[in-house]
Amino acid sequence: MSGNAALNRPLGGFDATMAGIGSIVGAGVFVVFPAAVAADGGGLAVPLLIAAVVAYACGVSIFQVSAALDADQANYDDGGTRAARLLLGPTAAFVTGWVFLCSRLAASAVAALMLGTYLLPDFAVPVAVGAVVLTAVLNIFGITRSDWVSRFIVAFVIAVLAFVAVAAFNSGHPPGSVKLATLPEPGLAGILESAALLYFAFIGYGYLASLGPHVRSPARNIPLALPAALAVVLGLYLLVGQSLLSYFGAPALAAEAAPVLGPVSQVSGSIGTGAVLIAAAAAGLGVLSALNAGCARVASAMSDEGELPSVFGRTRAALKGRPETHWAGITAGAAVVVVLVAAFPPGTLLGVAAFFGLLYAGATAVTAFSLRSRRWYTPRVLNLLGLAGALLLALSLPLLVISLGLMAIVAGAVVRLTFRRGR
């Protein structure tokens, strides 16, 4: 979930696939496997496959919605909101935008706590808060990563994950005594909950699906790049997940807070541990920066439509010579993430992020279903599959997660009634 908001040159099919892989592989892979194993009792292959299928179906919907917009409107951050307004009306647009904001704010909190848990587990919350503040300040000053830096980080993270998998398959078991979790009996409900949580690790697929204006021949390249990227990431996740299961065993993996560290802890000279920590920090900071800026852009678009206070639509340069940024949205988003980090444990935040990510995917599928013009590879049945899959997985999450999600939606309704302009 760490793609750049803009690209400097049109991409071919291979480059688009690589950009998609980079946007998907992020902070989620460092934290999602313990929660997924705890949900279904141990298996990862079937839930991962379900999550990937739902991601593909919903990705096609995002591609359709993006293709229906003008080039300057077809972006990942607020493209779904703009399309919903054009096709379904202002209420649908607000719901889509609000759900997007909730999803990305919760995902930011997960990424921040992941970073803190890996770097300084005894001070995870303070480190997470510091990371949120740091990335917000950088965004306010308009300091972003170049394309080549982003690609290097993605390549490094993937290489580290592959190294972890090899180390896990070739190691014994964790040294000393380990904490064991009590696992549920395997069943359909557990598989669906596990798939919903694992979906969080695929959420960045939407960035690739909305890359149309930045890709040569998007009608040909994106429908090929999307399944290719998801297939590569699915293979990577299967490799890493199965290797962690082999190393820890299901009960120990379910209780592990920083699972990717375990298999490399015995590598001589702490080289493996250092590489994992650097990868976790790079992935976490990259996700925080991208999501913070993305939420600010969505808030700005909603403000322009009169759905949020006008302050979110204003831009200002922090210093003379620096680019103008959506300072209010960046600041407000960071403040919300800090509250989430301080108030909720990582597992709850992961569930909430997955819940809202699935709701956003479902909302986009509804928007795509309403489109009349479509190609042979975007049938309405695929939109229905995405909608049904997203709702089924969302409702399979724990009652606490669903309750928190519904409370946030009610809060959104209050915000709209209070601040809506131009009625």
Model region roles, listed by residue range:
Residues 308-316, 362-378:
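Alpha-helical transmembrane segments
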Residues 19-28, 87, 154-168, 228-237, ...:
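Small-residue-rich segments of transmembrane alpha-helices in multi-pass membrane proteins
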Residues 2-8, 45, 49, 126, ...:
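Helix-loop-helix junctions that connect adjacent transmembrane segments
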